[in-house]
Amino acid sequence: MKKKIAEYEVGEQVDIFLLIKTATKGIASNGKPFLTVILQDPSGDIEAKLWDVSPEVEKQYVAETIVKVAGDILNYKGRIQLRVKQIRVANENEVTDISDFVEKAPVKKEDMVEKITQYIFEMRNPNIQRLTRHLLNKHQTEFLDYPAATKNHHEFVSGLAYHVVSMLDLAKAISNLYPSLDKDLLYAGVILHDLGKVIELSGPISTTYTLEGNLLGHISIMVNEIGKAADELQIDAEEVLILQHIVLSHHGKAEWGSPKPPLVKEAEILHYIDNLDAKMNMMDRALGRTKPGEYTERVFALDNRSFYKPSFHN
């Protein structure tokens, strides 16, 4: 079986089919245009540059295009890149299914649905349970397909649901340690906190921001969705406001995207759980591509650090 892109090491030659995840135009110091493309397959993605591109080439190499690439792997300032020597658009008789080139969550959708449903079933507050079930049912198809982000963490098919399942397990463990926490609020907050991303983001493949995503963002979108759900279900209770606050504050600070800091205990804990799971996902994926005794490539969202994989971690 042919190697996947994440399995190649620095210095190795590459001759492989990949999917263009994103393509961004830039202008080089010599004034000539170039493209920065992110290329992917199920193992992950890699950055490459296409230099001195013409308008015709720009139109060819766009997101969701499958290409045949030849080149070599290099380490440029701590980042792994693919230096392109040859590239062309793949023929239809060579590859046809884009889904063969995208990274997916390591857990089946039906298993994630079963687990999340169990957490909702455990809720004892009827207002919180009804609101959570209503909103998840409304957006379930997209929720199970979408990534949790365009980059940095859980940026793969079904990444949003996978992120939520991991966070629910963390929430349960923390609630068992600190029984004063309201499990219903915390579980609902975990399930709903990023659900607005099914409106903020364009879809599971070559994900970009929608108009609503750019102008409103997933936090504002979800606060409005909770309000609409409460009206439809005729729920006029403080739980609605608290759930809206938990969603509104889950980024922690204004400079991180939350209009209000957490002012409810469960909101504070949700912020930490969200942050922990996102960072663990970034570290695990970077370390998964690294040999024992070596450092990862720089992880931009983690202060551009390179993490060491101990030599005894085989």
Curated annotation (Swiss-Prot):
Keywords tagged on the record: Exonuclease, Hydrolase, Nuclease
Gene Ontology BP annotations: rRNA 3'-end processing
Lineage per the UniProt record: Bacteria, Bacillati, Bacillota, Bacilli, Bacillales
EC number from the UniProt entry: 3.1.-.-
GO molecular function, one term: 3'-5'-RNA exonuclease activity
Similarity remark: Belongs to the YhaM family.
Entry annotated with the keyword Nuclease: yes
Role: Shows a 3'-5' exoribonuclease activity.
Domain HD: 163-279
Gene3D superfamilies: Hypothetical protein af1432, Nucleic acid-binding proteins
Domain of life: Bacteria
A Pfam family recorded for this sequence: HD
Protein name as annotated: 3'-5' exoribonuclease YhaM
InterPro entries reported in the protein's UniProt record: 3'-5'_exoribonuclease_YhaM, HD/PDEase_dom, HD_domain, NA-bd_OB-fold, NA-bd_OB_tRNA, YhaM_exoribonuc/phosphodiest
